[in-house]
Curated annotation (Swiss-Prot):
Reported cofactor(s): FAD
Annotated SUPFAM superfamilies: FAD-binding/transporter-associated domain-like, Uridine diphospho-N-Acetylenolpyruvylglucosamine reductase, MurB, C-terminal domain
Pathway(s) of this molecule: Cell wall biogenesis; peptidoglycan biosynthesis
FAD-binding PCMH-type domain location: 31-198
Organism: Corynebacterium glutamicum (strain ATCC 13032 / DSM 20300 / JCM 1318 / BCRC 11384 / CCUG 27702 / LMG 3730 / NBRC 12168 / NCIMB 10025 / NRRL B-2784 / 534)
HAMAP family in the cross-refs: MurB
Keywords: Cell cycle, Cell division, Cell shape, Cell wall biogenesis/degradation, Cytoplasm, FAD, Flavoprotein, NADP, Oxidoreductase, Peptidoglycan synthesis
Reactions the enzyme catalyzes: UDP-N-acetyl-alpha-D-muramate + NADP(+) = UDP-N-acetyl-3-O-(1-carboxyvinyl)-alpha-D-glucosamine + NADPH + H(+)
Protein name as catalogued: UDP-N-acetylenolpyruvoylglucosamine reductase 2
Enzyme Commission designation: 1.3.1.98
Active site: R176, S256 (proton donor), E357
Described function: Cell wall formation.
Length: 367
């Protein structure tokens, strides 16, 4: 941006210009080159004002929250990084409504809700990133999705630069998807969640978490105290390297890298016949489809934890095959090569195409 525009943006209360930051600093993968410039916004008003000025100048923007769902190319990038640092969270204990600014750390939001005795998002504990990203990809884990509790989102329309609250029903929310994903038409400014007020979790599914909580398959609509569920989820995620720890390279990742594939029953049957394991995970996915486990497919295609082994710059986590990790000095090209190897290996073995979950900036899995 030219100096006059930079001065105008810097004059906005709550804005700080940053000429040194890289995307390696801004993402949980710790990979990525340098933006043309970066604009840090500490208030919603500052965020709206800065984006309007930058849009009016027709500059390419990348809106960055927690950086947990980004794969960014190496080198210098012709983009302005707008970093959302708004972090207010408000809770109405009477009706269970929680409102969070887009820049609030998601796990802090979950922690606050649990401390307040509110249920509904405890299964989403430990997920990295910001609150504003959760509706964009409809974040989910252990049988819970943000769409289960999301009532509305506050959006900045990038065309009109008007701010409005939009009902969750207008977002086309589905498995790891909303109509905000892969588009620059709007920026999430805040989210509103309707939570439960009786101190218990949302109904839990039997499975890994259910076994940890001693839930029986025969127990109808099981619920547990929210803190008990949060603690169990964090234990499970830490064991898989899915809670960010700066000293643990298994957590230098974008979380679950591939979505669980939704396939026709005939393809699921073919996978079952090929592997012959009676415990193959497969679940109803609606519309006559079935959901398979991406991690299970990766392992059965011959890719073990830690693949391709010690010394690799990018590898599968040593704790969980669904996380692609930076072992310390990986470049974007290293991660792309690994992602392509995994995707192509599963396709060749099972005929199932794995779809990456992160957003790609300046690079793609086919590069």
């Amino acid at each position: 941006m030219d100096s006059s525009l930079a001065q105008e943006i810097a004059a906005i209360d709550g804005v700080e210009l940053d000429s040194e930051v890289t995307f390696a600093d801004l993402t949980t993968l710790r990979i990525g080159g340098k933006p043309r410039s970066a604009v840090r916004c500490q208030t919603t008003e500052a965020l709206v004002s800065a984006i309007k000025l930058l849009d009016d100048a027709s500059l390419p923007l990348l809106i960055v929250g927690g950086g947990s769902n980004l794969v960014v190319a190496d080198g210098d990038l012709d983009v302005i990084a707008v970093i959302i640092e708004t972090d207010d969270v408000s809770i109405n204990l009477t009706d269970g409504l929680l409102t969070a600014d887009a820049g609030a750390v998601w796990d802090d939001v979950v922690h606050l809700s649990v401390d307040a005795g509110l249920g509904g998002i405890e299964c989403l504990s430990g997920i990295p990133g910001s609150a504003g990203a959760t509706p964009v990809q409809n974040v989910g884990a252990y049988g819970t999705e943000v769409s289960d509790v999301l009532t509305r989102v506050q959006l900045l329309d990038r065309t009109t630069h008007q701010v409005s609250w939009v009902d969750a029903s207008e977002l086309d929310l589905s498995y790891r998807y909303s109509n905000l994903k892969f588009t620059n038409r709007a920026v999430v400014l805040a989210i509103e969640l309707q939570l439960l007020t009786d101190g218990l979790s949302a109904p839990l599914r039997f499975g890994e978490l259910g076994r940890r909580l001693a839930i029986s398959e025969a127990e109808p609509h099981p619920r547990r105290p929210v803190r008990m569920v949060r603690d169990a989820v964090l234990e499970l995620r830490r064991a898989k390297g899915m809670v960010v720890e700066h000293t643990d390279h298994d957590t230098w990742s974008a979380g679950s890298f591939f979505t669980n594939p939704i396939v026709d029953p005939a393809l699921a049957d073919a996978v079952f016949e090929k592997v012959g394991e009676p415990t193959m995970p497969r679940f109803p996915a609606g519309d006559g489809k079935e959901k398979l486990s991406a991690a299970w497919l990766i392992e059965r295609a011959g890719f073990k934890k830690g693949h391709p082994g010690a010394g690799a710059k990018a590898s599968l986590s040593t704790k969980h095959t669904l996380a692609l990790t930076n072992r310390g000095d990986a470049r974007a090209s290293d991660l792309v090569a690994l992602a392509k190897e995994i995707r192509d290996g599963v396709l060749e073995t099972f005929g199932v195409t794995l779809v990456p979950e992160p957003v790609w900036i300046g690079i793609s899995i086919d590069d």
